[in-house]
Amino acid sequence: LGTEFPLIQGGMANIATGEFAAAVSNAGALGLIGAGGMNADTLRENIRRCKALTDKPFGVNIMLMNPAAPEMAKVVVEEGVKVVTTGAGVPSQYVPAWKEAGIKVFPVVAATALVRRLAPLGVDGFIAEGTESGGHVGELTTMALVPQVKAMTDLPVIAAGGIASGRQLAAAFALGAC
């Protein structure tokens, strides 16, 4: 993804603004704009603010249950966003246009059933998000979910939720996360 460190900041709604994402990207990780509490115009403004503050890679997290998700799906293409993560839904209808635009697509998954459904669409990897992550409804912990997802795919698997120390990071890597 072109970052200095193998870290992706969570796409936290109402917290991860363009400024926040730019600061994370400037520090060497992949900053994400959390579009969950935004409309399409607000997302566009945040993308432009982020671009003004960094020349480093950044992305956008789109919560697919947001009524503005169809418009946001177009905004990320129009604004040249390079990475999109998705949550709260299945991005099937958006993946072809995103891939055509050269966007890397990483859906958040809380169960292996979603991996089976999304892998054939040509996504670039999966974010295996366990119960330790805020606001999500999966039934598995991150450390239980990551090896299950990795066993189903050769695509990159990113561990999310409850990783707050070097030991936890090392455990995620040992279980197959990248």
Please give the residue ranges for each predicted region:
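Active-site entrance/lid segments in N-terminal catalytic domains of soluble metabolic enzymes
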Residues: L1-P156
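Catalytic alpha/beta core domains of metabolic enzymes, predominantly
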Residues: T141-C178
